[in-house]
């Protein structure tokens, strides 16, 4: 999945020091997954002796992208919706999000019968949806 940097936002304290940076991320995979995220980078995420002011936008985006795979497995699934054609479920979209330690992620996953090999799509449940999305994420983000 190609990820794009959509924004960089600096949080600055009263003394003018950058205390954290929020990097906006967006990515899409062939209409199957859409991810938007605001990942907060803290001083503890930086190499020793490095400050936020030492880093380019590209380097900050790389740090945020590096944090993303560890956050994806903790997504909470808020809803999933079946799409029906001729009274038969043909696909579903799962909506999930995370608000954790200053990072916010929204993931929309569109799944079809090929994602559920052991049962018809019309009979799948919550755990089946989570498992299918996890499989796709593990292929796109090998450490997730």
Give residue spans per PLM region:
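Conserved two-metal-ion catalytic palm core of "right-hand" nucleic acid polymerases
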Residues: 23
